[in-house]
């Protein structure tokens, strides 16, 4: 089995140490990873990839394409309401309110993390705002979970994001063996 990933690491939005641990676990199980690579062609012989300007053929009988999701904004009628859109979804404020004062947006249509935990929290914030309860969306407080074996999860900014922002921090990590 081969995984072709355009990013420098699998699970690019997660902590690099966590992503590397998961990749290492799957390598032990015989999965081959091609990072910083992209698929050029899928043909009868297999998959042609490009990495660092060089092409290579990966022999394959079957191919699973999993390249992410995109908010489906067609046929929703947002144009009739003059709702402002961004490149990846509907523009919302910290209360999940769109540019139309009576329309709120939650879930995949907002173009954020597109995870169930995010959609649930966005919905809570929207309902609270509609009811007059003070609440604001903070994506740093929403967990991200990947249901692999082993499962991985995280919440908050990654160590890399904190370093890049110049924010001081104290890092602690636990594996299932130390809990």
Regions found by a protein language model. Give the residues of each.
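A short helix-to-beta-strand connector/capping loop
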Residues: 29-31, 101, 167
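Extended hydrophobic-aromatic, low-complexity segments
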Residues: 75, 171-172
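Conserved small/polar residues in nucleotide/adenosyl-binding loops
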Residues: 175-179
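A short alpha-helix-loop-beta-strand transition element characteristic
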Residues: 84-86, 133-141, 167-170
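FAD-site-proximal beta/loop scaffold in flavoenzymes
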Residues: 57-131
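Rossmann-like dinucleotide-binding cores of NAD(P)H-dependent redox enzymes
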Residues: 1-44, 48-54, 114-120, 128-161
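Conserved beta-strand termini and adjacent loop/short-helix elements that scaffold enzyme active sites
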Residues: 36, 172-174
């Amino acid at each position: 089995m081969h995984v072709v990933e355009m990013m420098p690491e699998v699970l690019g939005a997660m902590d690099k140490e966590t992503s590397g641990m998961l990749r290492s676990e799957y390598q032990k199980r015989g999965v081959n990873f091609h990072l910083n690579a992209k698929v050029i062609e899928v043909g009868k012989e297999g998959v042609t990839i490009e990495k660092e300007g060089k092409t290579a053929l990966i022999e394959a009988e079957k191919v699973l394409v999993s390249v992410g999701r995109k908010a489906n904004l067609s046929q929703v009628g947002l144009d009739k309401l003059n709702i402002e859109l961004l490149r990846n979804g509907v523009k919302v404020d910290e209360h999940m309110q769109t540019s139309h004062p009576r329309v709120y947006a939650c879930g995949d249509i907002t173009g954020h993390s597109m995870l169930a935990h995010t959609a649930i929290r966005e919905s809570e914030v929207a309902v609270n705002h509609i009811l007059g309860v003070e609440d604001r969306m903070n994506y740093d407080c929403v967990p991200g979970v990947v249901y692999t074996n082993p499962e991985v999860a995280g919440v908050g900014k990654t160590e890399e994001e904190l370093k890049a922002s110049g924010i001081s921090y104290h890092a602690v990590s636990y594996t299932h063996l130390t809990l």
